[in-house]
Amino acid sequence: MTQHKLNKAYETFSKVISLDPNWAEGWNKRATVLYMLGRHEESQEDINEVLKLEKRHFGALSGQGLVQIELKNYERAINSYKEVQKIYPSMQSPKIMIPQLKELIKSESI
């Protein structure tokens, strides 16, 4: 997706949020766009809003894992993926990411 399209998507989801701030998916979609724009702290802020509205939103929790990886908060990323596993045990990304993150933490501590 081009930078222009991402910026347009950001504007659109910001308007959606202003119209209905209680719709978790509006926050989640904007969090995704912010992640794609490399605005990871802002993405996490929107994920926090999603989880206030819907604490079992596995998409937001999975996205939080990705954001926390970018912010180098690997333990927090692992915790996010563990929460996803509780809600959606058959989702594959936590099964892949948790071992990789544990290995990364181990290699960085050497």
What are these regions (language model features)?
Residues 2, 36-37, 70, 100-107:
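Register position in tetratricopeptide repeats
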